[in-house]
């Protein structure tokens, strides 16, 4: 199949899944900002996105996008390493036209994956998962189930801890680098690769990625500061 047998096809898959994930991040960031404005409003969104059939279908689709994106990322990385052979061990000057993020996308991607695991542990495992277990008549802790739709509570608990705050900010820093390169690179792979448009996409990537990451970081910092003012830091 062309999408898996050719380098161009794999890049197209990477690009399409990457753009879809960027759109999800935008929605997720906007949703999180609601928590700063209104805890009740945020909890309403969380309840709407609980263990309902449409939310579960969306979650499954999102998980598939992540898995495909990660698999193809490693696949392309290994392919590029194999193509370079022993040349990759040679000491040469780094090309000025090659960005730092481009040279370290694998490392940045690994940090993003670890951060994703941490995020799933702190939120998905305490919110949608208990509701899903309850709906399937599986054992779910009563207290955990009671707080499953209280997203504001989980944000407050997570970001009152300085360790989590630092880890999340490191994760977001890596995500920013990953997005700034990945966004315009995706457009390039999809054909927007002439000199005029590639420069425009690089500019758009930097602005867009900065807005998204700052939105996430704002939630982390605001809730941490609130916890300090309330004396609730762990």
Features from the language model and the residues they span:
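Membrane-embedded alpha-helical bundles that constitute the cytochrome b-like, heme-associated redox core
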Residues: 1-234
